[in-house]
């Protein structure tokens, strides 16, 4: 029996996808999201915890958080700045955990350490001592922020929780503020990491599809854009004033002030630029290959 989707709220569109640790996950045929059984989502919205953010959780996550802060986390932060269509004077890491990324950005860009901020609702006992590390929610902060990242967070959140986060970001954003989200999206789960759905150990309950994300974000003034070739990240912009003809303009023609900021730590600029460019052309190559194969199949089916 098909069930209703908690993400896009379409009725009877959720098909059984898989079972993990005795929890059933469903796939929405409308918004593509993969979500845990709705009873769990309802219980979480009522205050129950499937996987709490206690010290045992952080003990298992701190190593991964530290590794991300020195590698792909830095690349995602650099990309957010590179893609921004407004000058980045204030940057925020949302759901920052222990604040390792904040510390790394401060080390790489010491002359701009005050530019970077982080916020975390459920911090571990040991966390960053940076003065811009704040315990709380995005809505608690004084804006505006020009850019930011939210890395490995929303897969833990119910649609209602994500909506509250979106409302908070809207409060601290201005026109063209950009937020890059790093999360395992449905294509990533299906084709790259089926084990990403992990209710007990990591608390991953939903893989949000882009159509579902658009329904959630657009209501609050955000435009959602896919990142070419990346099945693990997307960007949202608040009340955007620009529309680019092609995504490549974001990395080939960034705002001069933002490129200058990244070039303060040259490797950060290169990491962001090459990540954007390589995945972009990988996506282009895949599309052209699929087109060529489809054309070949069509021609083979035609009588000579």
Question: Residue locations for each model-derived region?
Answer:
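Short, glycine-/aromatic-enriched active-site segment of Class I SAM-dependent methyltransferases
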Residues: 181-206, 211-215
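Histidine-centered divalent metal-coordination motifs
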Residues: 152, 156, 204
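Helix-to-beta-strand junctions that scaffold the AdoMet/dcAdoMet cofactor pocket
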Residues: 157-159, 173-175
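A SAM-dependent methyltransferase catalytic signature shared across enzymes that methylate proteins
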Residues: 8-14, 210-227
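Conserved N-terminal segment of class I S-adenosyl-L-methionine
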Residues: 1-151, 163-167, 181, 230-234, ...
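A short beta-strand-loop micro-motif that forms or neighbors metal/cofactor-
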Residues: 175-184, 225
């Amino acid at each position: 029996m098909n069930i209703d989707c908690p993400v896009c709220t379409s009725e009877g569109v959720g098909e059984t996808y898989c079972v993990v640790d005795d929890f059933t996950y469903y796939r929405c045929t409308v918004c593509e999201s993969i979500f845990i059984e709705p009873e769990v989502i309802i219980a979480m919205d009522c205050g129950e915890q499937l996987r709490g953010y206690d010290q045992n959780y952080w003990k298992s996550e701190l190593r991964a958080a530290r590794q991300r802060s020195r590698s792909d986390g830095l690349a995602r932060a650099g990309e957010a700045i590179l893609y921004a269509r407004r000058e980045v004077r204030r940057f925020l890491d949302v759901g920052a955990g222990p604040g390792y990324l904040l510390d790394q950005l401060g080390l790489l860009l010491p002359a701009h350490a005050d530019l970077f901020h982080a916020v975390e609702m459920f911090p571990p006992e040991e966390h960053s001592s940076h003065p811009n590390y704040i315990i709380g929610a995005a809505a608690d902060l004084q804006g505006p922020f020009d850019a930011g990242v939210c890395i490995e967070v929303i897969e833990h959140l119910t649609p209602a929780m994500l909506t509250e986060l979106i409302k908070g970001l809207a409060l601290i954003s201005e026109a063209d503020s950009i937020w890059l989200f790093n999360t395992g999206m449905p294509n990533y789960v299906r084709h790259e990491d089926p084990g990403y759905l992990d209710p007990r150990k990591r608390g991953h309950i939903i893989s949000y599809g882009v159509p579902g994300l658009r329904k959630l974000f657009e209501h609050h003034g955000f435009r959602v854009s896919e990142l070419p070739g990346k099945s693990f990240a997307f960007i949202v912009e608040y009340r955007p004033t620009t529309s680019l003809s092609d995504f490549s303009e974001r990395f080939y023609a960034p705002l001069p002030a933002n490129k200058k900021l990244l070039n303060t730590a040259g490797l950060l600029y290169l990491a962001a630029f090459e990540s954007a460019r390589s995945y972009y052309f990988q996506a282009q190559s895949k599309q052209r290959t699929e087109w060529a194969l489809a054309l070949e199949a069509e021609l083979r089916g035609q009588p000579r």
